[in-house]
């Protein structure tokens, strides 16, 4: 383990609301070893932004990690040229131009149809009736797995996210997550012969990715491409409803819906944490990290760094959010960021 200052946390409280503990770490020990997580946490924006790029020290390759065990080794668990080759293969499906010209009209049509269906009812469950299906429909289109239902897409995404964070080794969670990955593989086999031209499945297949890499990366896209937009859509709407002065800024033309999304993503980062493994001894601010040490880059904490954001716990869509690294930094910047902002 590193010789970083030690900070203890209550896991139950941390899982429910990590932000008070993260604020304490930023103020008192911005790089700190947390025994309950068996990891050294980086909590300040600049430290994360700087060192996340140093893949020669902070490696994403984790052969025994929960994500790799569950999905296979996807691009998120690769570095350097191996990562970039798969990222380039996926890029035609998720480039800003493709999102603007191809996906945006599809997303908008889906949202309008759903709103028109819900309007006569007078009320709805924001997550179940709107955020979940609108996000799932978009993801079915992007992946090319149109044979999946919206509910199936949501279920398998959540099951994989639960599996990737199943550090306690709960058998029911493991069983559910493995069932989800098998279902995804079945749908990939079904869709592969006639996958839509712009879909992730089609462009990666055309680029010659192996079956193993293609399957692993489709699972990766699903794991983050459903639950994160679903929660961001519902969360942004919830935040605006509960902060009427912020909603009024949009209605009066003083702010945009994108401003609201960017602020919500800063406030409740879609990527709360990204793990790394130390592969070469390194010293930072007199803290020595040793090979095999685990490091967690806490992107959720970076979005509330007081150095860049005044009153960081406050939802304020008028603030400048450019310094936020809500979608990561460097080589592992979220490949679906343009699609997420569009949704």
Residue ranges and their predicted role:
Residues 1-343:
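Cytochrome P450
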């Amino acid at each position: 383990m590193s010789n970083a200052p030690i900070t203890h946390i209550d896991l139950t409280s941390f899982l429910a609301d990590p932000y008070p503990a993260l604020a304490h770490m930023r103020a008192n020990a911005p790089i700190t070893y947390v025994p309950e997580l068996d990891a050294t946490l980086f909590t300040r924006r600049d430290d994360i932004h700087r060192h996340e790029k140093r893949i020669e020290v902070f490696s994403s390759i984790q052969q025994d990690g929960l994500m790799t065990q569950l999905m296979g080794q996807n691009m998120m668990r690769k570095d350097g040229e191996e990562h970039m080759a798969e990222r380039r293969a996926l890029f035609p499906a998720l480039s800003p131009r493709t999102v603007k010209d191809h996906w945006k009209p599809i997303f908008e049509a889906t949202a309008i149809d759903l709103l028109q269906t819900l309007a006569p009812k007078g009320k709805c469950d924001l997550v179940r009736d709107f955020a979940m299906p609108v996000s799932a429909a978009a993801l079915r289109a992007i992946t090319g797995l149109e044979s999946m239902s919206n509910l199936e897409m949501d279920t398998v995404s959540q099951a994989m996210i639960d599996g990737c964070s199943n550090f306690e080794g709960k058998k029911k969670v493991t069983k559910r997550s493995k069932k989800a990955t098998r279902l995804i593989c079945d749908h990939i086999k079904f869709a592969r012969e006639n996958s839509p031209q712009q879909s992730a499945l089609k462009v990666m297949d055309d680029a010659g990715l192996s079956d193993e890499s293609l399957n692993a990366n489709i699972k990766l896209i699903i794991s983050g491409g459903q639950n994160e937009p679903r929660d961001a859509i519902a969360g942004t709407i919830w935040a605006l409803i509960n902060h009427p002065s912020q909603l009024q800024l949009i209605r009066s033309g003083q702010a945009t819906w994108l401003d609201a999304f960017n602020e919500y993503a800063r406030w409740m980062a879609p990527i709360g944490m990204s793990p790394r493994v130390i592969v070469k001894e390194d010293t930072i601010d007199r803290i020595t990290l040793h090979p095999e040490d685990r490091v967690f880059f806490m992107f959720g904490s970076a979005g509330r760094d007081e150095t860049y954001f005044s009153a960081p716990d406050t939802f304020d869509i008028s603030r400048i959010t450019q310094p936020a690294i809500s979608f990561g930094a460097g080589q592992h910047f979220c490949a679906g960021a343009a699609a997420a902002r569009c949704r």
